[in-house]
Amino acid sequence: MNPVGINGTLIVQLVTFVILVALLYKYMYGPLRKVMDDRRAKIADGLAAAERGKEEMALAQKRATELVREAKDKAAEIIANAERRGVELREEAQGKAREEADRIIASARAEIDVETNRAREVLRGQVVELVVNGTQRILHREIDDQTHRDIIDRMVGQL
């Protein structure tokens, strides 16, 4: 026996322990470490994906807000254009109505002038006829001043 207490059993146990550690390292620790590294990578990828999702969500929210603003602006523009077109149509209709009214008034005035001239011609003819009749009556009989005045008054009354 050795004074240190190293014997063959201890060496065999030591070699067996080293082989066991080598086998555990090769078949257990390596795959376990790989599984842990894969899990760590998956967790990191998941966190990165969550962060990207957050950023994409913020970007989508920003785009949605921008689209809503653009839609409101477009709606306001459409409303303004519709109001402007409505004013234009109203003014155009008023202008056409004014032109039509002016045309009708001018036509009515022309018709009134024609009717007035026709009435004047008729009256002129009647006055001439009355004067001729009155003159014939005066010439056919002798009249005194009173009869003359009566005839003139009757002629004026007929006018």
Curated annotation (Swiss-Prot):
Leader sequence segment: none
An example Gene Ontology molecular-function term: proton-transporting ATP synthase activity, rotational mechanism
InterPro entries reported in the protein's UniProt record: ATP_synth_B-like_membr_sf (IPR028987), ATP_synth_b/b'su_bac/chlpt (IPR002146), ATP_synth_F0_bsu_bac (IPR005864), ATP_synthase_B_chain (IPR050059)
Compartments, as annotated in UniProt: Cell inner membrane
Membrane topology: Single-pass membrane protein
Keywords: ATP synthesis, Cell inner membrane, Cell membrane, CF(0), Hydrogen ion transport, Ion transport, Membrane, Transmembrane, Transmembrane helix, Transport
Cysteine-cysteine disulfides: none
Description of how the protein assembles with itself and partners: F-type ATPases have 2 components, F(1) - the catalytic core - and F(0) - the membrane proton channel. F(1) has five subunits: alpha(3), beta(3), gamma(1), delta(1), epsilon(1). F(0) has three main subunits: a(1), b(2) and c(10-14). The alpha and beta chains form an alternating ring which encloses part of the gamma chain. F(1) is attached to F(0) by a central stalk formed by the gamma and epsilon chains, while a peripheral stalk is formed by the delta and b chains.
PANTHER family: ATP SYNTHASE SUBUNIT B, ATP SYNTHASE SUBUNIT B', CHLOROPLASTIC
Task of the protein: F(1)F(0) ATP synthase produces ATP from ADP in the presence of a proton or sodium gradient. F-type ATPases consist of two structural domains, F(1) containing the extramembraneous catalytic core and F(0) containing the membrane proton channel, linked together by a central stalk and a peripheral stalk. During catalysis, ATP synthesis in the catalytic domain of F(1) is coupled via a rotary mechanism of the central stalk subunits to proton translocation. Component of the F(0) channel, it forms part of the peripheral stalk, linking F(1) to F(0).
Family: Belongs to the ATPase B chain family.
Protein name in UniProt: ATP synthase subunit b
Source organism (scientific name): Acidithiobacillus ferridurans
